[in-house]
């Protein structure tokens, strides 16, 4: 799992799935170093808190910061797990280029929630665990600029899978020992 990117619209289940990936990895390999988890929301909120990114500015800086950190982690032999919306071909290419430059294996994962009522319920009921981060409402999510991602290595529907099942599918494609 040297560089795994988990993307999808807000409230699709990215945070829950990433937490499960880390939990399962720790369970299976308690002595190994876990992947470095880079959350674009955390990075972009820190940039807003610092005044370097205005609340009205479109996200983008967070992706470049995360890619730079990912390059350093990969160069030191570490693994990286990125959680981001990853809405456009531009952001998706950034991760491919980051992995390629580091000579790292790359896995792209798109999470979807095909049940609109469930997706809406999640969006309305979730609470941010990032201080200061205002989560988008359902209307913002449905109006978001998000391009289809047919080239993702794995596309998982979180309305049909639990977070643990999705995490197992991801780990199964990119196990820690490099086997498949």
Give short role names for the model-derived ranges.
Residues 3:
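Walker A (P-loop) ATP-phosphate-binding motif of ABC ATPase nucleotide-binding domains
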Residues 6:
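Hydrophobic anchor at the beta1->P-loop junction of P-loop NTPases
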Residues 9-10:
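The conserved Walker
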Residues 15-76:
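Conserved substrate/cofactor phosphate-moiety recognition/catalytic segment
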Residues 42-44, 87, 112-118, 160-162:
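Conserved nucleotide-binding/hydrolysis micro-motifs of P-loop NTPases
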Residues 60-106:
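Glycine-rich phosphate-binding loop used to anchor ATP phosphates in small-molecule kinases
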Residues 102-123, 156:
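Conserved phosphate-donor/acceptor-positioning beta-strand/loop module used by diverse small-molecule
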Residues 125-169, 176, 180:
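Small-molecule kinase domains that catalyze NTP-dependent phosphoryl transfer to phosphate-bearing small molecules
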């Amino acid at each position: 799992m040297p560089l795994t990117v988990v993307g999808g619209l807000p409230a699709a289940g990215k945070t829950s799935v990433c937490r499960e990936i880390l939990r399962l990895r720790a369970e299976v390999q308690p002595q190994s170093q876990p992947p470095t988890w880079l959350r674009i929301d955390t990075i972009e909120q820190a940039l807003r808190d610092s005044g370097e990114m205005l609340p009205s500015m479109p996200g983008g800086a967070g992706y470049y910061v995360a890619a730079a950190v990912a390059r350093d982690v990969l160069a030191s032999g570490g693994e990286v797990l990125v959680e981001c919306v990853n809405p456009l071909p531009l952001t998706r290419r950034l991760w491919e280029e980051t992995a390629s430059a580091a000579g790292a294996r790359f896995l792209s994962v798109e999470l979807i929630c095909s049940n609109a009522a469930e997706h809406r319920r999640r969006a309305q009921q979730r609470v941010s665990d990032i201080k200061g981060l205002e989560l988008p409402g359902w209307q913002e999510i449905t109006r978001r600029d998000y391009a289809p991602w047919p080239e993702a290595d794995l596309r998982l529907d979180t309305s049909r899978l639990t977070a643990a099942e999705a995490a197992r599918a991801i780990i199964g494609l990119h196990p820690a020992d490099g086997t498949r």
